[in-house]
UniProtKB/Swiss-Prot annotation:
Membrane topology note: Single-pass membrane protein
Subunit structure: F-type ATPases have 2 components, CF(1) - the catalytic core - and CF(0) - the membrane proton channel.
GO cellular component term of the entry, any: mitochondrial membrane
Major subcellular location class: mitochondrion
The organism's place on the tree of life at top rank: Eukaryota
Recorded family membership: Belongs to the ATPase protein 8 family.
Location relative to the cell: Mitochondrion membrane
Name of the molecule in the record: ATP synthase protein 8
Transmembrane segment boundaries: 11-31
Role according to the record: Mitochondrial membrane ATP synthase (F(1)F(0) ATP synthase or Complex V) produces ATP from ADP in the presence of a proton gradient across the membrane which is generated by electron transport complexes of the respiratory chain. F-type ATPases consist of two structural domains, F(1) - containing the extramembraneous catalytic core and F(0) - containing the membrane proton channel, linked together by a central stalk and a peripheral stalk. During catalysis, ATP synthesis in the catalytic domain of F(1) is coupled via a rotary mechanism of the central stalk subunits to proton translocation.
Keywords associated with the record: ATP synthesis, CF(0), Hydrogen ion transport, Ion transport, Membrane, Mitochondrion, Transmembrane, Transmembrane helix, Transport
Amino acid sequence: MPQLSPMNGLLIMFSVTLMLLIVLVINHFMLTPMASPLLASHLKTKKSGGEKLYY
């Protein structure tokens, strides 16, 4: 297995964190227009295995 240079590792970490950040931002903006009770119930279903709907 080729050893990654510190720069490559940093680049990979940066891209991964950037992707996660983008996903979080998109989720946030998609959920914002909803009413707060809807948001609460949505988060509850998401926690209780509602993730299946997203994949």
